[in-house]
Every structure is written in C-alpha cells, then in structure tokens.
Amino acid sequence: MTQRVQTVEDLAQLVEAQRSKRPFVVAIAGRGGAGKSTVAHQLAMRLIDSAVVPLDDFLVKASMLAPRVEDHFDLLRVEREVLISFTQGLPFNYRRLDWDTGLLVPIDGVIDSTLIVLEGICAFEPPLEAYVDLSVWVDTPANVATERGRERDEGTENVHHWDVWERQDTDFLARRQPERRASVVISGS
C-alpha cells in the first residue's frame, strides 16, 4: 500500500524507521521537472551517511530522443557500477556523462556510504527495482513540472527537447505506472 508524506522531513523519518545497518537504497522517481533532484538532495542532507546518485549521470546522450524514456538511460551500467558494489557494502565510483564532451568521466572521489538515493524517472524500473528498499514518487502536475523543467533548462540545448520529453514522460507513466508502484508518494508542488 502506498503511503503519502507531506514533507521531506516526514520522508526522512520514514526512511530512518525502515533503515537497517545494511546498505539501503531509496529510489526517487517523478516526471521531468517534478522536483526529484530537490527532494533527493534535501533527503540526503537529513540522513546520516548518505549519497545521491542522479540517473542523469547515466544518460545515453545519443538516445535522449528515443521514443521510450527507459532507453534514455544505461540502467545496466547503474547496476554494474553502483548497485552491485553498494549492496555488498563496498565503496564505489562510477562514470558520469560529461554533457559538454558526451564522454563518460569518473566522478570525483569514491562513495562509501550506507544509504544511497537514486534519483530519476526510471529509478525503480528493472533492473534497478531489485535493489530498491524504498521507492518514492514525486507527485507534481504535468503542467507545473514541464514549466519548471523548461525554466531550469533555459539557455541550454535541452530546452528544445521539452515537447518531446513531455510526451515521452506521459507515455512512460501510462505504460509503467510508477506512481502506483511506489511505496511512498510526496508532493512536488
């Protein structure tokens, strides 16, 4: 059954109540512009020994306009470079997309935490869902999310893709219904 929380503080309390000593994965999903990154970073600031892993670091730039949102990300690389090591209690490093060059470059340092927050529209899709301890949907009306996304991306190459991305998000939500599969729903507006 899906639980609703009102604030990030409520979400942090819920995570702490469920968190155990083993590695713990919180997955935060929502449509583009919903506020996923904001919720993820605010949550991580409230939790001891946590780190945020944005799925945008795993975008495949050449696939950003592919019809299916799932094809925009290299989810198998998330599993290989992050989740396998993390769930074994090992420190990890991964390669992120450098937007300027289109190349994969190592992140600075090594992540050695007991909780990670995966953040992105596909954060609890296969194969990632098998590793997720708590799934969170950021519920934001489509028009609000799209407006935010356009404002955020103003002046970048991404601003021109929002019409396509909005349709892709709508298709993804209709097919996969992540908001119905989430353990927790939090308002993003």
PLM features: residue spans?
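Small-molecule kinase domains that catalyze NTP-dependent phosphoryl transfer to phosphate-bearing small molecules
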Residues: 103, 125, 154-189
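Post-Walker A helix-loop "phosphate-sensing" segment adjacent to the P-loop in P-loop NTPases
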Residues: 44-53
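Conserved lysine of the Walker
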Residues: 36
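Extreme N-terminal, non-catalytic leader segments
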Residues: 1-26
